[in-house]
């Protein structure tokens, strides 16, 4: 399994990092079989699999539950788990308890924190405590209400310079990697070039050191909105819908289950029980 040092070496050797989300054991197994470098158990699971409108309702217990499942499905892949909304903005002791549960109880290999200057101290203290941290800048879904919705960040010179400063600050604080979301390609490329830690983009162009996408978006699973930066490699929703409809039709018609999908007694047992053959 790769380590934090492995990812730094990949950047040095200009080898791109492939990261993908997973929220359960079966999807984690498929992602691992595809030789993905890193799995993200994102709090995006709130919208993707739990039916919420945002990541805000996702709890620490939710993240622990899903990280455990992913760990069981992908035992040999580095797993990064999101610390959910407001679990790292109170006292550091509370933050440390949550981090400990995600690492020790759930089995995460690293934790991801969203924010900018307000999380620098937390990153530094968690890193000193032995917790590997991935920082998340640009569009930060946990702060979407403050940021005014899901929109591209750092679109002007002032905000682009601030983003670069924030990126350098999280690196200095000890983060071993950085996720940049919904940032213009030129800005993300500059940040990737100026940082020594890997920069993983999502909607941030090809100049990043790696890419991350949501599993369900990539395979077209579900009816949710697919962001414009996502490349959908297959759409499995329609075949699933067709299979469900066919199942219902066959049950209603009495054609499922047929003899190929049912168990039958041996002839001598039928004779003993019922005194003759059954039709």
Curated annotation (Swiss-Prot):
GO terms for biological process: pantothenate biosynthetic process. 3-methyl-2-oxobutanoate binds at residues 43-44, 82, 112. The active site is at residue 181. It is found in: Cytoplasm. Pfam families: Pantoate_transf. Binds 1 Mg(2+) ion per subunit. This is 3-methyl-2-oxobutanoate hydroxymethyltransferase. It comes from Halalkalibacterium halodurans (strain ATCC BAA-125 / DSM 18197 / FERM 7344 / JCM 9153 / C-125) (Bacillus halodurans).
């Amino acid at each position: 399994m790769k380590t934090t040092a492995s990812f730094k070496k990949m950047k040095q050797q200009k080898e791109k990092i492939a990261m993908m989300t997973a929220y359960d054991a079966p999807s984690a197994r498929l992602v691992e079989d595809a030789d993905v470098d890193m799995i993200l158990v994102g709090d995006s699971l709130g919208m993707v699999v739990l039916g919420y409108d945002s990541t805000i309702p996702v709890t620490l217990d939710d993240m622990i539950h899903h990280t455990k499942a992913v760990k069981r499905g992908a035992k040999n892949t580095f797993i990064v788990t999101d610390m959910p909304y407001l679990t790292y903005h109170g006292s550091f002791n509370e933050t440390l308890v949550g981090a400990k549960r995600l690492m020790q109880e759930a089995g995460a290999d690293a934790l991801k924190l969203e924010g900018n200057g307000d999380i620098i101290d937390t990153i530094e203290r968690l890193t000193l405590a032995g917790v590997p941290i991935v920082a998340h800048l640009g569009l930060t879904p946990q702060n979407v209400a403050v940021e005014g919705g899901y929109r591209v960040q750092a679109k002007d010179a002032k905000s682009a310079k601030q983003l670069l400063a924030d990126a350098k600050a999280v690196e200095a604080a000890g983060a071993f990697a950085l996720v940049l979301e919904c940032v213009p390609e030129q800005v993300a490329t500059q940040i990737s070039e100026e940082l020594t830690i890997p920069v993983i983009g999502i909607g941030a162009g090809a100049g990043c050191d790696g890419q991350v996408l949501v599993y369900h978006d990539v395979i077209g699973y579900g009816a949710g909105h697919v962001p414009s930066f996502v490349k959908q490699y297959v759409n499995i929703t329609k075949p699933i819908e067709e299979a469900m409809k066919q199942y219902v039709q066959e049950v209603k018609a009495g054609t499922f289950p047929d003899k190929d999908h049912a168990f039958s007694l041996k002839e001598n047992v039928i004779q003993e029980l019922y005194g003759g053959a059954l039709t």
